Amino acid sequence: MALLEYKCPACAGKLEFNANAGKVKCPFCDSEFDMAMFEQLDAALDSQVEENLSWQTASTDTWTDSDNAGMAVYSCQSCGAQIVTDETTAASKCPYCDNPIVMMGNLKGDLKPDLIIPFKLDKKAAKAEYTKHLSGKKLLPSVFSNQNHIDEIKGVYVPYWIFDSKAEASMQYDCTTVNSFTVGEWRVTETQHYKAFRSGSLEFENIPVDASKKIDDSLTESLEPFDLSQAVPFQTAYMAGYMADRYDVTAEDDAERVNARVKTSTERTFADSVAGYSSVAVTDSNINLKNGTAKYALLPVWIMNTTWKGNNYIFAMNGQTGKFVGDLPCDESLKKKITWGTAAIAAIATFAVGFLIHLFT
């Protein structure tokens, strides 16, 4: 994860990327700057290019000595997360598990992102959506709704591999049609069997697969979809005021996951074309994936973690669309209190009714 500082040329204040305006803004003097002014700086930092992956990827740029100037890499000894901050930051906490982090090295040689989707929703929107997520949860432990805790929600650019692939497939199916009719006194069921064949190709573009071991795959998949048409070429200025997770899953490691998603989608698409039968069963499947390429991208996610009774609960919101995900626990002790309280009220009501009946009879 990276937390970078840019100084305002007007007042020397710390600049931040404003999600609503889509510009870099100074919160002290309200000066606004278009992203174009940072292009020349990034072009100079990107002057050294190096091939880094043997697998077919669109990503070739790496962090260089000039990129690393004034930056340090920290590691979380608890969950293994690696983050990048400016060297003036003496200490920080992990956004995934809230544990302390320690200095470990720099980014030189690491692959640099190709694309980034800037945050569209700010911290205020994330807090509002989290509060809405808690609404009506009467058995929720109080730590989850503590206002000071809600203020700890963090904007994190999560690393993703964006895959493009072509699937060439041929499928064979056993199909049946079933008809019932009456002949005299007999009810006849006629089942006819058919063979169906399908072949063709499908193009897949912009399949996102997260490149971080610290966040659960099911959580990141639940945050989808991201509108990748809004992705722009990576510039470090977009990270001002936010963090960016350092990827620890390579494109090769993620290939198995994306291949499974492509194959599942291909099988479903082909099966949808076999219509008009009572039953359809696949008997042979041959799917070949070709021309697979991957781009390295950073996608915006608001993250908050809460530890309760030894378990870590992570809540996340898509920083582009506002989609919110995360499981909430039930406070069993509070549940028992409510149950006993309800039972006590019922007992008192029953006693009162009985007493009144006895009194007036």
Please tell me what each predicted stretch does.
Residues 13-16, 34, 84, 102:
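Short functional micro-motifs and their immediate structural scaffolds
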Residues 21-25, 38-44, 88-93, 106-112:
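Short cysteine/histidine-rich zinc-coordinating motifs and their immediately flanking basic loops
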Residues 3-5, 21-23, 69-73, 91:
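Residues immediately within or flanking Cys/His clusters that coordinate Zn2+
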Residues 8-11, 26-29, 76-79, 94-97:
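Short cysteine-rich clusters marking metal-coordination/redox-active sites
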Residues 30-37, 98-105:
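Short Cys/His-rich micro-motifs in 6-15 aa windows
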Residues 163, 295-345:
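Extended hydrophobic
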Residues 351-361:
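Juxtamembrane boundary at the C-terminal end of a transmembrane helix
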Residues 109-307, 311, 359-360:
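Charged, low-complexity helical/coil segments in non-catalytic cytosolic or luminal regions
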